[in-house]
């Protein structure tokens, strides 16, 4: 869990940030004669739904800190802490117990035994793509999105 937002007041909602950067990348490709810049989503990707949404919004890669920390082979043995946590005079993160859910292969490829988004990330991506009619990730990255605003309670 990162406390950067609370500590230094810097944060953009991840979906908005990914979509804005992907759009800026498209503009840059036009201006630079086709030079492609990778978009890597990092932060708040704790479940397969967030992973799928990041790709749908245009990310080329997704950092999966907490999900990978849940694998039984992970060195933290069910504990996760982001690199932002380490700072000499201004720590901004917390060591978090995320637990273990199974081997890395199960985290990535399943099977899932609960509908909590903690395992089978690739299966979730395949299901989302099939449900929306996409057969490849490149086109899925450009799918239309509808944002439904809500207020947290």
What is each model feature region?
Residues 8-41, 46-153:
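Alpha/beta catalytic cores of nucleotide-metabolism and tRNA/nucleoside-modifying enzymes
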Residues 1-6:
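Gly-rich Lys/Arg/Thr-decorated short loops/hinges at beta-loop-alpha junctions or inter-strand turns
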């Amino acid at each position: 869990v990162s406390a950067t937002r609370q500590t230094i007041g810097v944060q953009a909602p991840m979906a908005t940030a990914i979509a804005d950067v992907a759009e800026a990348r498209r503009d840059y490709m036009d201006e630079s004669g086709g030079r492609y810049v990778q978009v890597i989503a990092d932060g708040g990707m704790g479940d397969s739904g967030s992973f799928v949404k990041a790709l749908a919004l245009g990310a080329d890669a997704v950092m999966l800190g907490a999900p990978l920390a849940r694998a039984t082979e992970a060195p933290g043995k069910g504990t996760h802490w982001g690199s932002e946590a380490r700072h000499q005079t201004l720590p901004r993160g917390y060591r978090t117990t995320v637990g273990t859910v199974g081997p890395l292969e199960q985290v990535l490829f399943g099977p899932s035994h609960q509908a909590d988004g903690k395992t089978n990330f690739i299966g979730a991506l395949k299901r989302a793509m099939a449900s929306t009619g996409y057969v490849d990730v490149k086109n899925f990255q450009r799918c239309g999105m509808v944002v439904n605003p809500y207020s947290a309670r």
